[in-house]
């Protein structure tokens, strides 16, 4: 097995963060509604907290090359992640925060009679998705422009919603989860891939990692229950939630 070199990964995450690397845990101070609080922002956060977790900055279009880096499968075993998604050939999947479509177009190969909604809010990423769809002559992926609070999907339309290193960046996690809940069919599922916050050896900034305990609190508060947890990926949790 090749030894994975994390230095490029660490450098990129650091470059996207604020220059102040002395990050402190900042307690939220001003209470708002629906589980949100406001407080002083840390180096990588927006100063908005959900159920005690500070929300991180969003990776912008500047991160496109990193999302498509040649070493990504070696570092994260993305092929194994796609292989383990609970899919049928006719499944309807929503890739929330699809970015460049790295996962979207790989998943599309597993659902030739299904549909994949590639949901994005950033115009630059949406342009890249359309370019890639045309380049690949793809007939499965449908590109959807979402908002910060909703994926803009039809109610009861989707079997599986996927978020890959996206959930911790959602500015409105409560609203997004509730919108996804409506979009999922009865028995629908969410899969979250998130960098493991419990593991200090994972070379990612703290706000870009999450713990299972924290994710469970947030998902359960919005109508989901954890049905499968696995750590077969090198640095990410693989968590499957079902509608209650």
Tell where the protein language model's regions lie, with residue ranges.
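Conserved SAM-binding strand-loop segment of SAM-dependent methyltransferases
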Residues: 136-148
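Conserved class I S-adenosyl-L-methionine
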Residues: 89-99
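A short glycine-rich, Lys/Arg-flanked "PGG" loop and its adjoining helix->strand segment in the class I
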Residues: 174-189
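Core SAM-dependent methyltransferase catalytic element
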Residues: 222, 227-244
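Conserved SAM-binding loop of SAM-dependent methyltransferases across substrates and taxa
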Residues: 100-112
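Class I SAM-dependent transferase core
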Residues: 25-86, 92
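A short acidic, Gly/Pro-enriched loop at the edge of an enzyme's catalytic core
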Residues: 151-160
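Conserved SAM/SAH-binding beta-strand->alpha-helix loop
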Residues: 122-123
């Amino acid at each position: 097995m090749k030894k994975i070199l994390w230095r490029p990964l660490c450098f990129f995450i650091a470059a996207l963060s604020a220059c102040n690397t002395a990050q402190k845990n900042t307690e939220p101070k001003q209470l708002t509604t629906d589980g949100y609080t406001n407080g002083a922002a840390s180096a990588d956060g927006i100063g908005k907290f959900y159920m005690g977790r500070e929300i991180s900055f969003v990776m912008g279009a500047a991160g496109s090359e990193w999302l498509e880096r040649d070493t990504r499968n070696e570092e994260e075993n993305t092929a194994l992640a796609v292989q383990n998604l609970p899919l049928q050939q006719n499944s309807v999947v929503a890739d929330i925060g699809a970015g460049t479509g790295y996962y979207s177009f790989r998943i599309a190969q597993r659902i030739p009679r299904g549909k994949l909604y590639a949901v994005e809010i950033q115009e630059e990423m949406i342009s890249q998705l359309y370019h890639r769809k045309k380049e690949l002559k793809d007939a499965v992926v449908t590109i959807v422009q979402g908002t910060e609070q909703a994926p803009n999907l039809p109610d009861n339309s989707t079997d599986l919603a996927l978020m890959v290193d996206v959930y911790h960046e959602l500015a409105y996690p409560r609203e997004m989860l509730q919108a996804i809940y409506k979009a999922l069919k009865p028995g629908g599922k969410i899969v979250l891939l998130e960098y493991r916050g419990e593991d200090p050896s994972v070379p990612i900034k703290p706000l870009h990692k999450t713990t299972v305990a924290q994710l469970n609190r947030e998902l359960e508060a919005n109508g989901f229950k954890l049905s499968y947890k696995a750590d077969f990926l090198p640095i990410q949790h693989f968590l499957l939630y079902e509608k209650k």
